């Protein structure tokens, strides 16, 4: 199909959806879209990794940062203008950058299936313990329905909102959903064997693998190096957690675990602000596009490293968290995520 025909059809779909618009409906769609923004992802990952479940937080963090970096690279390669650039009549909200694929759709299809699997799926409800039977008949457990709604329904709803708001063609949303679901399914299927394989590598080889992945993403990302830097720093921080010790998120009282969040945000903000100051000073002394991109990469890499490694170390030093031997950590994490009655 000719791309122009596809985009014309997409504009027709957007116009048809917008004929039902109202201030209230538009507000609802903007609220739905918020649940697939970087700020919301950031909050979810930090809350999980620092306070609730470090293993799930780490997986979701790697997945959403990688998915976002991949989305940025593809957008820079395709360079498809947004629908409201092609037809100003569908303009409702301002969005920067290119259109294809939809970042909100891809991000939600990456995050929410993993959230449903590793967070919501960590425990069975009472109905599941009974084998899903009710009145002698087998029914789909409520917890399974909830996980399906989160894993599939929410990404579809977010994609719908992006079309309604006129910031993406239907084809953008479909492309983003496919990429996101492929990413989340890949994490679910291959995370454990890949992690087991890489864990036997030397730290230098692990670092080389991370550097190669980030380098390849950088080749297609144009001037957008932020997420690539965050991915590098986040994975570098994981490498720094050696095989003898792991950050134990479950240690501490509820208040101690809660205090990690404002403390970690403050430390991350200071580190990020420091590198922002360095970046601004360097640009005033010797400005160049290459220097600007490098400093932006370093700034976000530092942020990812602080979140992944330095903040947990600070929590441990201040008595807000503990470390445990990796073997014990794995057993404890397995116990936390294993459904009751299934653990060996």
Language-model segments: residues:
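Hydrophobic transmembrane alpha-helices of secondary-active transporters
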Residues: 53, 236, 307-310
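Charged, low-complexity surface patches
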Residues: 21, 63, 222
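Membrane helical hairpin/interfacial module
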Residues: 51-81
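Low-complexity, compositionally biased segments
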Residues: 56, 130, 335-337
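N-terminal transmembrane-helix/juxtamembrane module of multi-pass inner/ER membrane proteins
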Residues: 1-40, 71-99, 252-263, 267-271, ...
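Membrane-embedded catalytic cores of phosphoryl/pyrophosphoryl-handling enzymes
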Residues: 28-29, 42-50, 58, 68, ...
């Amino acid at each position: 199909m000719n791309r122009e025909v596809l985009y014309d059809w997409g504009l027709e779909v957007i116009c048809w959806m917008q004929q039902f618009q109202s201030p209230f409906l538009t507000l609802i769609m903007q609220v739905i879209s918020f649940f697939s923004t970087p700020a919301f992802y950031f909050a979810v990952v930090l809350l999980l990794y620092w306070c609730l479940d470090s293993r799930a937080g780490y997986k979701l963090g790697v997945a959403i940062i990688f998915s976002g970096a991949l989305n940025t690279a593809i957008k820079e390669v395709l360079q498809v203008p947004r629908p409201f650039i092609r037809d100003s009549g569908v303009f409702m909200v301002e969005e920067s950058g290119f259109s294809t694929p939809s970042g909100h759709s891809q991000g939600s299809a990456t995050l929410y299936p993993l959230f449903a699997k590793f967070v919501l799926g960590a425990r069975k409800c009472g109905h599941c313990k009974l084998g899903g039977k009710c009145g002698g008949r087998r029914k789909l457990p409520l917890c399974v329905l909830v996980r399906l709604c989160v894993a599939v329904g929410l990404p579809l709803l977010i994609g719908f909102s992006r079309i309604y708001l006129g910031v993406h063609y239907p084809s953008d949303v479909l492309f983003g959903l496919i990429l996101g679901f492929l990413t989340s399914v890949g994490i679910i299927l291959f995370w454990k064997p890949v992690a087991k394989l890489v864990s036997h590598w030397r730290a230098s080889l692990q670092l080389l693998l991370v550097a190669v992945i980030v380098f390849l993403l950088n080749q297609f990302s144009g001037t957008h190096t932020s997420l690539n830097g965050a991915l590098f720093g986040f994975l570098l921080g994981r490498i720094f957690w050696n095989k003898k010790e792991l950050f134990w998120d479950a240690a501490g009282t509820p208040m101690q675990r809660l205090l990690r969040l404002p403390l970690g945000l403050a430390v991350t903000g200071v580190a990020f602000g420091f590198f922002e100051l360095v970046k601004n000073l360097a640009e005033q002394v010797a400005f160049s596009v290459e220097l600007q991109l490098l400093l932006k990469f370093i700034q976000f890499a530092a942020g990812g490293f602080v979140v992944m490694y330095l903040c947990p170390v600070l929590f441990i030093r201040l008595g807000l968290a503990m470390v445990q031997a990796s073997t014990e950590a794995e057993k404890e994490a397995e116990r936390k995520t294993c459904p009751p009655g299934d653990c060996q």
